Design a protein with these regions (language model features):
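N-terminal secretory signal peptides that target proteins for export/translocation
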Residues: 1-8
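Short stretches within intrinsically disordered, low-complexity N-terminal or propeptide regions
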Residues: 4, 19-26, 103
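Cysteine-nucleophile amide-bond enzymes
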Residues: 26-210
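Bacterial N-terminal signal peptides
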Residues: 10-21
Length: 210
């Protein structure tokens, strides 16, 4: 147990050093970058999913600069009540620790962002169901990021509502039961933590409080 504790402590310090280095050298945000938000406290999403470096990532948004290279930065994000454009300063204020991801494949940035923009105004999908008219945060990315040939950058993965023990958590059982539904465990979908771990995403920087 002592050696395990030492390994955990070492991992913590390595992770903090990595984040500090990345924050100091974070590159300028580019069109189509992905902003992964790390929650300050565990929640129902981070209880059943895990982000890059085991970070508690529970949201993702798409960087978009309005009006060309010198225009203001916004993010396109799926939040309640609907997909919207949010000024970058507002997003950073609401999400104080953000990991910056960049797709490392030759994808069609212009078309991908344009597809995301077409979703602005669509209702937020708090049921996380595939194939409906509503959209949740990582689904916005998964559905709309495309390669030059039109195929999707990100395939779906089986939805996870279970914790590390393999049991579906009480929160999600109660959440769906109150809506007269079964938990959609294993249905095709996505989540922001898993998206941050994809091999085609490189974490190139971070923003967090000093």
């Amino acid at each position: 147990m002592a050696s395990l504790g030492i390994r955990i402590i070492r991992f913590h310090f390595v992770l903090m050093a990595m984040l500090a280095t990345m924050a100091a050298s974070a590159q300028q945000l580019q069109e189509g970058d992905l902003l992964f938000s790390c929650t300050q406290e565990p929640n129902a999403i981070t209880d059943v999913t895990s982000g890059v470096a085991h970070l508690p990532i529970d949201h993702v948004a798409v960087v978009h600069r309005i009006g060309g290279a010198q225009g203001p930065l916004f993010v396109i994000e799926a939040v309640k009540p609907a997909v919207c454009l949010t000024p970058i300063d507002t997003f950073m204020y609401n999400n104080p620790q953000v990991m910056v991801g960049r797709v490392n494949q030759a994808f069609d940035v212009h078309t991908s962002v344009k597809r995301c923009l077409r979703m602005v105004g669509k209702p937020y999908d708090d049921l996380y169901l595939p194939g409906d008219s509503a959209v949740y945060c990582s689904e916005l990315v998964q559905m709309n990021y495309v390669l030059e040939d039109g195929s999707r950058v990100f395939e779906t993965v089986p939805m996870s509502f279970h914790d590390s023990s393999g049991q579906i958590t009480d929160y999600w059982i109660d959440f769906y039961s109150s809506r007269g539904m079964e938990v959609p465990e294993g249905e095709p979908g996505t989540n922001p933590g898993e998206l941050s771990r994809r091999p085609m995403v490189t974490i190139i920087g971070s923003y967090h409080p000093e």
